[in-house]
Each structure stands twice: as structure tokens, then as C-alpha cells.
Amino acid sequence: MELQEVLHMNGGEGEASYAKNSSFNQLVLAKVKPVLEQCVRELLRANLPNINKCIKVADLGCASGPNTLLTVWDTVQSIDKVKQEMKNELERPTIQVFLTDLFQNDFNSVFMLLPSFYRKLEKENGRKIGSCLIAAMPGSFHGRLFPEESMHFLHSSYSLQFLSQVPSGLVTELGITANKRSIYSSKASPPPVQKAYLDQFTKDFTTFLRMRSEELLSRGRMLLTCICKGDECDGPNTMDLLEMAINDLVAEGRLGEEKLDSFNVPIYTASVEEVKCMVEEEGSFEILYLQTFKLRYDAGFSIDDDCQVRSHSPVYSDEHARAAHVASLIRSVYEPILASHFGEAIIPDIFHRFATNAAKVIRLGKGFYNNLIISLAKKPEKSDI
């Protein structure tokens, strides 16, 4: 089975769907919103071609569920707010939004949300039907998606960590698995495995930047949010917990060791310095803004979450419920690729053990994602300067 056929979130509206388990990602979007607004402000002041008539925007790796249109909503609100600040509120441009993800993404569930979204946009923003046009653009952002120099603003959140393929070189010439008992490039992975994953990410991210530079107009903007490497205080990440859960099942004889050793998730969490260096080396973009922030991976469990507090406060007294919440989110993201390799029957057991391990981490006040926000501008051609 092709990787692109299984590298997608759980679709639909069921209990295991991404749509029902994406409250964490709503918090990420809320943290990014002020940066998004500033990015839009700089974009509109750059006076790019045709920008006062039609702003062309894309969300790269849009997934499905309510968060998909929340990103669009935040972008439209930012554009209208900045236009009003510029005393151009009577000249609001048409906004054309492209939602992009792999072909197996549940675009249909997003389309079902559009009528109510358009009504809300008209009621709260005064934008009549037709002033914001939303379309799907299925495909991989590791290749070209749009015509040359056609886009003003590109956005991507929590997608860039996914690789275009499992790195090569994870099996030796003798057929021995180099990444035994691991499912990704963890701290325990041998140096050759870590290098293979870094090399694949470097290739993919560099290609991503080159493709986007071809699609963006000169001085167009791009806003990226992704998970980045944290520190020891953050505790094990969710991929570590998933790896532990699968190893538990191997130890119990529920899964064969060879099944674990042949499974490698195409995901890489880069460091801030790695991302920064790759942007600079590719050369098409100027870094305008770079910031990191931490979120507990059980953030979003309740609306009262103080998602950045590091403590043993009473918020951790319900660690089992919080751990189950985290397990549901991770299941909604990784179930398709796990089921394609291990089979559907074992999935509930994997995430039962995942939740057990996550509860131990949460009880200790650990379990954080380190996040990177980076705002980029396409460098102008010499003829544009």
C-alpha cells in the first residue's frame, strides 16, 4: 500500500475521528493567531500585484474537521481587520482559499461545513456569499500545487514533520533492521538512523521551500507552525509513548518483534536551529519572525486548561482522563498507518497501553510539545528591487 494512502487523519465524525479529537490543535491556532495577524498586516502593506482585488491564500496540510475552517476564519478576520486599520474597509478584496492535503483526506466532511461557515461570515463579518471562495486542492506539498507566482499567502500548521517517505538505509545490506525496537528517529536510535531521518527531512523541507517560492509572488508571505525538538524537562513525547505501547505488546507476545522492527513512521521533529539553517541555505526566503512555545500534550482536555503551567497542581489529579484524551488525539492521527501495518484488531490495545503510559507522565507534571512558529517572506527578484 502506498504511503500517501494511509498517511492521513481519521475522517468522518465518529468518536475516533480527527474532527472529534482536535481541541489541542485549536489551542495551537489560538497561540499563532497574533502572529498570523501581523503576517497579514505586512503582506497587505507590501502592495503585491492584484492583492487589493483578490488575495489568494492556501492552507497546506489542512486535514479535516472544524479546525480546517477555523484557520480560514482567522485569516479572513485578520485581512478585514488590517484593511480597516488601513482605512480601506470599503475596498475589502475577494479572498480565494485553497485547502490542500493528500488525496485520502476527508475533504467531503469539510465541504459539509461550508454553508454554515459562509452564513457566519456574512452575519459576523458582513462578507456576502462570493466574497470568500473556498476550494480543495488535493496533492502533496512536497511537489508543486499552484501555478508559478500565483499565491499571496501560504499557511501550514502541524504538517511539516511528516516526511514524503520512510527514509532509506534503515535496513543493512545483510537485511538487518538498523532501528530495532524503535518506530522513528528517537534519542535511542543509532546515529545512522538519526542521520537517515535528518537527511530525508532536509531533502523534503528544502523541496517544500523551493516549491513554495515558485508559487508565491515576490514578497509573498508564508507562516509555518510545527513541532520542534524540546528538552529533557518536557518528558517523553507522544511518539515515545506510542513506541512504548507497541513494545509492551511485543513483550506480551501480542505482536511479533519482526513486525515492530519493520515499522518506521515517516516523521521527523527538527530542532529550531535545523529549520533556521535549512531556510537560510535554500535561500528563497527571509525569516521575519521566529518563536517557540510549549504546550502540554493534554492541553485542550478542558476549556479551563492553563496549557503552559509546569506544576503538580490539582489539574493533574485526573491524569487518567487526560491521558485517555491524549490517546484519542494520537489515535485520530496515526490509526490509518498503524492499522495498515499491524492490523485493525490490535489498535484498541495499542492505545489502551499508550494511555496508561501517558498517565504516568502527566502525573509527574511532564509531557510537553515544543512548538515553532516561523514567518517568512519570499525574497524579491533583483528586477523587483
From Swiss-Prot:
It comes from the Eukaryota. Gene3D superfamilies: Methyltransferase, alpha-helical capping domain, Vaccinia Virus protein VP39. Mg(2+) binds at residues 179, 261, 263-264. S-adenosyl-L-homocysteine binds at residues 18, 62, 67, 101-102, 140-141. Its EC number is 2.1.1.-. The keyword Iron-sulfur does not apply. Pathway: Alkaloid biosynthesis. The record marks 155, 267, 344 as: Involved in substrate discrimination. Belongs to the methyltransferase superfamily. Type-7 methyltransferase family. This is Probable caffeine synthase 4. It comes from Coffea arabica (Arabian coffee).
